[in-house]
UniProtKB/Swiss-Prot annotation:
Pfam families: Toxin_cobra-type. The keyword Glycoprotein does not apply. Residues 1-21 form the signal peptide. This is Cytotoxin 1. Basic protein that binds to cell membrane and depolarizes cardiomyocytes. It also shows lytic activities on many other cells, including red blood cells. Interaction with sulfatides in the cell membrane induces pore formation and cell internalization and is responsible for cytotoxicity in cardiomyocytes. It targets the mitochondrial membrane and induces mitochondrial swelling and fragmentation. It binds to the integrin alpha-V/beta-3 (ITGAV/ITGB3) with a moderate affinity and inhibits protein kinases C. It also binds with high affinity to heparin. GO terms for biological process: killing of cells of another organism.
């Protein structure tokens, strides 16, 4: 009985992923990656000349400021970029 209970606890821990991990899209939205510790934002980077097609996506710790050439869009939920 103790073995069964221990097995259930281990399976629950593995399935629930007790440490929350953020998943962000890569450049191709079909593919995603799990962000490392400390990188708690997803981002999309656009060139200001064409705001319809992102040129880079991934995980980041702080959302960068926009510049004259580049615009960043950041968010904090799974695959939001």
């Amino acid at each position: 009985m103790k073995t069964l209970l221990l097995t259930l606890v281990v399976v629950t821990i593995v399935c629930l992923d007790l440490g929350y991990t953020l998943k962000c899209n890569k450049l191709i939205p079909i593919a995603s990656k799990t962000c490392p510790a400390g990188k708690n934002l997803c981002y999309k980077m656009f060139m200001m000349s064409d705001l319809t097609i992102p040129v880079k996506r991934g995980c980041i710790d702080v959302c960068p400021k926009n510049s004259l050439l580049v615009k960043y869009v950041c968010c904090n939920t799974d695959r939001c970029n």
